[in-house]
Structures are given as C-alpha cells and as structure tokens.
Amino acid sequence: MALADKRLENLQIYRVLQCVRNKDKKQIEKLTRLGYPELINFTEPIDGLSALHLASISNDTDMVSFLLKLGAHPDVQDHMGCTPTMRAAELGHELSMEILAKAKADMTIVDNEGKGVLFYCILPTKRHYRCSLIALEHGADVNNITYEGKPVFLRACEEAHDVKDMCLTFLEKGANPNAINTSTGRTALMESSREGVLEIVRGILERGGEVNAYDNDRHHAAHFAAKGGFFDILKLLFAYNGDMGLIGMDGNTPLHFAAMGGFADCCKYIAQRGCDLKWKNLEHKTPRVVAKDGGFKAASKEIRRAERTAAKLAKTGAKNPNPLWALRLHDWSIEHETSLRNAFKFVDRGDGVVSKDDFVVALEERQEYATSEQLLSVAQMHEKSRGGGVNINEFFKGTKYLSKSYVLGSFGPKKKKRGLGKKPRKGKFVLPLPICTIPENAFPRRPDGGPPYYMIETYQNVSDSHRFNRDHPPEHPIQDDSEWYIDDPSRVFANISFITKAGDLASLKKAIETGIPVDMKDNTYKTPLMIACASGNIDVVKFLIEKGANVNATDNFLWTPLHFACHAGQQDIVELLVKAGASIDATSINNSTPLSRAIESCRLDTVKYLLDMGAKFQIENRKGHAAMDIAKAYADYRIIDMIKEKLDNLPKQADNQKMKGKLPKLKTEGTDVKKEEETLSSIYTVPAITEEKKVHRDSVVYLNSLITSGFTKKVDITFIPKRIWSPEATTAELIRKRELRRERFTYEVDFEDFMMPFQKNITEKAQALEATLKN
C-alpha cells in the first residue's frame, strides 16, 4: 500500500490514527472524504501501521467494521510485513479476526520472515486456539514454512505441552507429519517427543511420520523421549519400528540420556529393546557409569541387570529367548489392541480363541515386523493342544512367547500380594516432634464473638483518595469531611505477628490502646518483640520497648528476644535490648545463650559486643559444647581467634588448686531442670485482657450526678471530627526507609531469595560442601 512520505500525507495519516484511537468516526469519515485518495490505507512512516492495524490491535470490532466499510484493505502490511489479521491473531482478538476473515482477508500472506498467520496463533490460550480455527477455515496454509526453513506445524510442536489441541488440529487439517526444520534437522516428531505429549506423537506416527529420522546432531525422537523420561513415548516409538540404539554425534545413545535423568523404567526398557549397553560416549562413559555418577542407584541397578543378561547370551550356543522382532510384535500389538480385538471378533470361536491360521493371517495383513514363519511359531506357543487355537487375552499378555520381565505388564509400580507373609522388620523408634502451638481454647474470646486476642484489628486510613494521599494529607481535621460520604470499611483482623513483621506501627498502636497486652503471644508462643527482633525491624523494637515490652520474655523453647536478635545478626537491636535490661546470659531449653546464636550467624561485631559486655563463653549446652566448639563447627576463623584470645587472657590456675580437683561447673542440673519446669508452666498463661467498664448512660444515678455537677448548664461548642487522618510516611520517607534497609541488610533485601545471616551462612556452607563432594 501507499507509504506516507510527504509532510502533508504524514500529518493526515497521523490524524487518522489519532481519530481511530479516540473512536472519532465523524472525523475519520471527513478525512477520508476530503483528504488524500486512499488515505484510509496509508501507513505511518515509522512502523508502517495503518488505521486498520490500530483497530485490530485494540480489538475494537466496531471500528474495524467501520474502516472496512470506508474501503480499508484487510491485507495492508506494516514494515514487518504483518497484516491486521496477523496482529489480531497475535493478541488473540478472535472477534476482530472473524470480521477481517469475513472481509476476505488473505490468510496465505506471509511477513518479512515468511511467517503466515498461523505462526501468530501459537500461544497457550483458548482465544489463540479459536483464532487458529478461524484462520484454517478461511484458507490458512497449514504447511507454511518460514524463509529459514521452519514449518508452522513444527513450531507448534515446540510448544506442544501448552498448545496440544492446536497441534492435533493442524494434523487433522493436513499438516505434513514429516515437517522438518532444514537449518537444524529437527522434525515435528522430535519436538513433540521432547515435550512429552503422547497424543501428538501417536498422531504423527499414525499419519506416516518417519520414526528414525535424526537431526544434525544425530539425535532422533527416542533420544529426546529418553532425556525427558517419557516411558509411554518410548513404547510408542519402538512399536512403530523405532531404533533404540542410534548413536548421536556426542556418542550418547537413548540409554545414556535415560541414565542421566535416573529414569529406571526407561533404562530397563531401552536396554531390553536393543541398545548397546557397553557403548561409551565421547566422555568415555557407559550408561551405567553415567547413572552411577549421577547417584541414581535404581537406574544403575537396572542397567547392571541387563548387562548380566547380555553377558549370558553372548556365550557360544546361547539362544536369545526374547528376539527383537518378538518384542516389537508385543509392543505393536499392545498399541493396536483395540483394532486387533475388533479384527479377531470376526474369526472368534466364541470363547476368546481363534484358530492358528486366522491368527497368522490377521497379523500378517496389519504389520510387517514379523514374518509368517515367526507368527506361526508364536501361534504354536499359544496352542495347548493340536488345533487348540490361540487365546487372544494370553497373546496380549505376551508371557507365552516372551520372558515375564520383558512384557509391558512388568513395568510400573508392583502390586502388593495379599495373604500371610513375614512381618516387616520394625525400624528404629523415632519420637515424633509435635508442632508446638497454643490451643485455641487457651485464648480468651472477644465479647462480640470475634477472633482470639492475638488477632488484632488492622488500622485503615479511610479517606477520599482523589483529594488526599500520603504526600498531600489534610491540613486540618475539619478539612477532611470524607467520613460523611464514604462508607466505613469492614473490620479486618490479622495475626499480631504478621502485623509486627510488616512494621505496621499504626495497627500495633491501636491494638495496645484498646487494651491488648504488649506481650501478647500468638499461637506459636512468640511475642511481638521476638518477631520484630527476628525480622530486624528496629523501629518496631523501639516502639515496643517504649510501650513496656518484656525484654526477657520466653517462648516454648525458652528463647528470649535477645536470642532472636543474635540469631538474626542485628547488632543495633542487640545493643538496644541489652540497654533495656535484657539478660545477656539467658539460656534456652538446650542451654544455648545469645552468644551461641551470634556465633552460629557468624556475626563478628555481635560476638565482640557480647563478649565486651561480659557474656560467659564457658557455658556449655546440652551436648557439652562451649562457645569455642560452636565456632569451630561453623568454621569462622575470625570468631575462633577472638574466643581463643579471650581464653588465653583468663587467669591461670595455681598448682595447689589443680590438686583439689575439677572446678565446679557453671550450671547445676537440678536447678536447671527446676527453672525449666517453672518457665514451661508459665508459657501457657495468656495475658489477661482488661475490659473497659461501660457506663450505663440511662442510669438514674449517672443522670443525677450530671445535674448536680452543673453539666446541663454548660454549653459545649467543642468540634469532634468523626475521623482523624493518621500520619502516614510520605513517598520520600518510604524511599529513605528502603535505603536504610539496604544499608542494614545489603542490597539483596529487595530480592525474593533474600536470607537472614544464619540461613545465608548455612546455605553457603552446604553448597560448598556439596561442590567438594562432587569434585
């Protein structure tokens, strides 16, 4: 079509495009009538878009119909060679595409890369599938090939898992089952096998797809199916005369790929169906070595078993009881069981048995893998007596002419045998660790039947968002009259721990003002101060300490807030808690101190601060490990040197003191147990909730007191607003808060995979250990 290259033409086409966006039909009609001839089909000079392109992209069916009536051509192409139909198909606009198809849009046009409209329909939505149906109904080429040599059917098979119905439709409409990408050598069968879609693989093979074609790397469909562990596809490929022993350019057979993934059933099947078990790839590894290197014991065991069988058959005079033609006949008969049973019905004697001759004739007409002599030998194996015939059910089982481990029924999960047998050996008793939660009945309920008190009401700053926001709050309570025309929102309750972790100070302040204790424990025994210390939220920690939170409160594991702060590696919070009176040597249920938690997190500054504040580093936990033992276990040499220096600075014992015996331990077992029992018993107590006493305003005593106090003579002109705007952090303050978080937690805090110091330390050491073991 005409390309606008002059200034006036540019202005007019841009004006038309703007009118299309604004849906100004009158102006479009006027420009078409008074402007340049064929202006409706002009394209803008940058992307080459016409008016019909824009209408199709926005799925404005009314505008598409209007433009077509004005003479817009449905096949105008942009700079990429795309028509409005292609643009509509790409976005799944089926309504616009249907209108364009009725306007006789040419569905065989290709873009600058040789892609037809069907290429733009290959996306995993129902709308794109319906667009492909519209294109096929109006003459789209199902065998369209790009200039690089990629057919549209092969492109769909690359996404077969998501567009299965579309691929099957392409096959039904006559797509070439042997579609091949000339640049890579990949076929549609290879791509559908790689995706693991059995229905498409079956459809391609039924329509004559070449099963043993291979790509530029000499990989064929069995390689891709084995790599993904698709056992059903491997069975299907072998049933259609697939070669399980083809060797790729990298020296890998399908068995190598199955061993790489540890697919035991696939390894067993491929090993039985003619693959070379001793073949080495370019890395000089056999399939069994590949499975062993990957740590797949089951796959390695199956390959080893097949190697033993192959070694026995390699001896002179040994006869193979499971020849390849018999295995292929068995797999083919299972794949075509329905059609074979229908064929055998016509010659059935009435008891599920057919004569030997009829059996041979029926199979000889339908397959070419076994000769008539071989089929006759199979029939004779099924005959119990001369002229007894072949039982159809036994033939499909395959156990009469194949070993039991070679038939398809031997694959898959084994069924448990019923009956008496040996009792299984009892394993070592493991005490189950219960999930420690406070019972719901231990929490007092609200008088109005609401949730437990650890579920607090969230604060909602309800106001007219069109007038006020966090950067432009109301200057005076009288200015904000939103309460008079905005409905009150419904009450929303959230766990106090979630509120604390999110740093919602407004909701916490509201809860404390309404009588919720500042040390209210949630159903996992954690107080808000513990949660704030664990998440590293110093603002919430300061707020809770100001409100009188207990800095020595314990959970069910006797962890204090200082334990959580040291475990999270938050130096500033540790200092804040110690200044507020936190016990620096508080022991948990396994006698671990906050110093132990700081060492586990490998936080040198926190460890140094605790030692400078007088933390006892000789205290041992239940396992008898002191601070030095824990530091060695977590392999932080900086902390080891620091503790060693402290140990060296301890005063040495005199000789006469050594003769008196060992020094008394810093802890005694009896007092420790007693302390634990007392602490554990107090864990289950939930703080009492103080209810406000409601004054009965209709009481005679109350009204009489008002009269005597002269309240009725006073004129109160105080204005009390219904709702007061709660100060919110401005955008600048939120940005500054994010900057501070990055300074405290590093830049990684903005990513989803951010980990606190302890978790990060453990993960890094585990990954390093895993890498060492692999090498």
From Swiss-Prot:
It comes from the Eukaryota. InterPro entries: Ankyrin-EF-hand, Ankyrin_rpt, Ankyrin_rpt-contain_sf, EF-hand-dom_pair. Coiled coil: none annotated. Keywords: ANK repeat, Repeat. SUPFAM superfamilies: Ankyrin repeat, EF-hand. ANK repeats lie at residues 47-76, 184-213, 217-246, 250-279, 524-553, 557-586, 590-619, 623-652. PANTHER family: ANKYRIN REPEAT AND EF-HAND DOMAIN-CONTAINING PROTEIN 1. This is Ankyrin repeat and EF-hand domain-containing protein 1. It comes from Mus musculus. The lineage of its organism: Eukaryota, Metazoa, Chordata, Craniata, Vertebrata. The gene is Ankef1.
